[in-house]
Amino acid sequence: MLKFAVLLSVLACALAGTIPDGLLPQLDGRIVGGYETSIDAHPYQVSLQRYGSHFCGGSIYSHDIVITAAHCLQSIEAKDLKIRVGSTYWRSGGSVHSVRSFRNHEGYNSRTMVNDIAIIRIESDLSFRSSIREIRIADSNPREGATAVVSGWGTTESGGSTIPDHLLAVDLEIIDVSRCRSDEFGYGKKIKDTMLCAYAPHKDACQGDSGGPLVSGDRLVGVVSWGYGCGDVRYPGVYADVAHFHEWIERTAEEV
């Protein structure tokens, strides 16, 4: 199955009819093949929450801006969103902030998953400290084979229904887009130029890590977007390519 699985008690109705058959948004899952980590190691990581439940990740861009995936915010109103920052645990700790507004990329397509990126403005400025920091966005793609890390909260298996409290992370390698769409893997032409792939055998982001950070060289290089299964050797994880959206992020962060 695809790694996108909606937390049924929270978002199933909101997302019905907007995602292609077999391609459900990855809104509440876990890192596959990874390890427990702390927010001090990933101080840019946030938890997007609705009705008190974690459903997506995100990355701190500035004192009042968070970057996430567009598919996380379909059929959702800003007043229903909360952002927890500064905690290793999505359920407690740190601080929780209301959302003033958000904007999905104008070219986002829920069928092809192109332009799967969004900007959130929170109500109050964040106070930066060791557990709450912005991350710089990439202005060029990392090289093929570069080490990257993805972090998030989620279930213990693809399609699972419970999520751990503790933040998890996994180390991956960047795969060039042309290689990701080659016969070596199973995606073919589904991989577009707005996307970035990362891979390690039996390691991956999974349901619930959506919108979260893929970081390489201390830069945000990707936003967790989609993929078939979790940790399937035939299918790398697919991310929104942050370098491709660099100008859009800067502009939208001023406008939203």
Curated annotation (Swiss-Prot):
Principal place of residence: secreted
Example GO biological process: proteolysis
Keywords, comma-separated and alphabetical: Disulfide bond, Hydrolase, Protease, Secreted, Serine protease, Signal, Zymogen
Covalent S-S links between cysteines: 56-72, 180-197, 206-230
Positions of the catalytic residues: 71 (charge relay system), 116 (charge relay system), 210 (charge relay system)
Subcellular location, record wording: Secreted, Extracellular space
InterPro entries membership: Peptidase_S1, Peptidase_S1_PA, Peptidase_S1_PA_chymotrypsin, Peptidase_S1A, Trypsin_dom, TRYPSIN_HIS, TRYPSIN_SER
GO cellular component, one term: extracellular region
Protein family membership: Belongs to the peptidase S1 family.
Protein name: Trypsin epsilon
Organism phylogeny: Eukaryota, Metazoa, Ecdysozoa, Arthropoda, Hexapoda
